[in-house]
């Protein structure tokens, strides 16, 4: 039995199948941890979502910003982007079952000293605190008034965590941290403008995971979201978004032994396949 964490798939279905073949994934005895952004922008969003749902007993998936975006577009709260590849899901006969399954995925998963989250954790948060905060968002997403959450989910504010935050400001802050965070100030104020490489981070900002005395430094955090960051491997940190969508690689980390497995973007996947180039 082995557990594999897999980086952002984003509808790159054939690349996923190639990676599963490489690691010899056996759904009877193995487990997958998916870092979120399962769907969108790659050509196989419907196939990828159906595959994940059909293997739900063998995987844990946390929500990413593209997964939440799909839910908001499906409910009509935001317009689809030109780069979205979600229409096949919306037109599918099993659309409602697929979207409900997606809506009930967690924001964060913690097990045996390891944490799975899509983008990151605010440096002020301990892993235990973050798990409880993520559950607040999960209750909103799974409750009868989930429409209200999706309708007011978008926005960049507030950027600074305060324990007294309430209502949608609190839920939006938690959601943005867990699904959109890359860099912040040393005191933990989030910046959503920067999406580039480590060497290009502007003065006064730093990766969330490099903030001194980060509250979650006592656990191993596994995340994705930041494709320009590339593969990062530290004793207590693994970044697994290696840009498969952009013609890079799809990456898996076997938690037992911390071994990395990678496959190149399949020719049928990624933005080149969509653009016909």
From Swiss-Prot:
Its EC number is 3.6.1.41. It comes from the Bacteria. The keyword Chloroplast does not apply. InterPro entries: ApaH, Calcineurin-like_PHP_ApaH, Metallo-depent_PP-like. Keywords: Hydrolase. One of its GO terms (molecular function) is bis(5'-nucleosyl)-tetraphosphatase (symmetrical) activity. It catalyses: P(1),P(4)-bis(5'-adenosyl) tetraphosphate + H2O = 2 ADP + 2 H(+). The keyword Hydrolase applies. Hydrolyzes diadenosine 5',5'''-P1,P4-tetraphosphate to yield ADP. Belongs to the Ap4A hydrolase family. This is Bis(5'-nucleosyl)-tetraphosphatase, symmetrical. It comes from Methylobacillus flagellatus (strain ATCC 51484 / DSM 6875 / VKM B-1610 / KT).
């Amino acid at each position: 039995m082995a557990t594999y964490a897999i980086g952002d798939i984003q509808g790159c279905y054939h690349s996923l199948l190639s990676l599963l073949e490489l690691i010899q994934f056996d759904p009877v005895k193995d487990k997958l941890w998916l870092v979120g952004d399962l769907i969108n922008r790659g050509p196989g969003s419907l196939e990828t979502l159906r595959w994940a749902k059909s293997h739900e007993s063998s995987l844990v998936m946390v929500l990413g910003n593209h997964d939440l975006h799909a839910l908001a577009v499906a409910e009509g709260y935001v317009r689809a982007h030109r780069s979205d590849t979600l229409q096949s899901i919306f037109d599918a006969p099993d659309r409602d079952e697929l979207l409900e399954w997606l809506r009930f995925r967690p924001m964060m998963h913690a097990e045996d000293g390891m944490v799975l989250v899509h983008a990151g954790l605010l440096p002020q948060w301990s892993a235990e605190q973050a798990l409880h905060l993520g559950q607040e968002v999960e209750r909103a997403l799974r409750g009868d008034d989930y429409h209200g959450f999706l309708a007011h989910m978008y926005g960049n504010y507030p950027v600074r965590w305060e324990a007294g935050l309430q209502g949608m400001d609190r839920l939006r802050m938690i959601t943005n941290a867990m699904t959109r965070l890359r860099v912040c100030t040393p005191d933990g104020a989030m910046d959503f403008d920067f999406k580039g490489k480590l060497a290009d981070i502007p003065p006064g900002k730093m990766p969330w995971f490099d903030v001194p005395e980060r509250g979650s430094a006592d656990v191993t955090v596994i995340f994705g979201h930041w494709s320009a960051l590339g593969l990062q491997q530290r004793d207590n940190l693994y970044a697994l978004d290696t840009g498969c969508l952009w013609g890079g690689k799809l990456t898996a980390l076997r938690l037992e032994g911390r071994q990395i497995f990678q496959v190149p973007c399949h020719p049928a996947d990624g933005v080149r396949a969509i653009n016909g180039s």
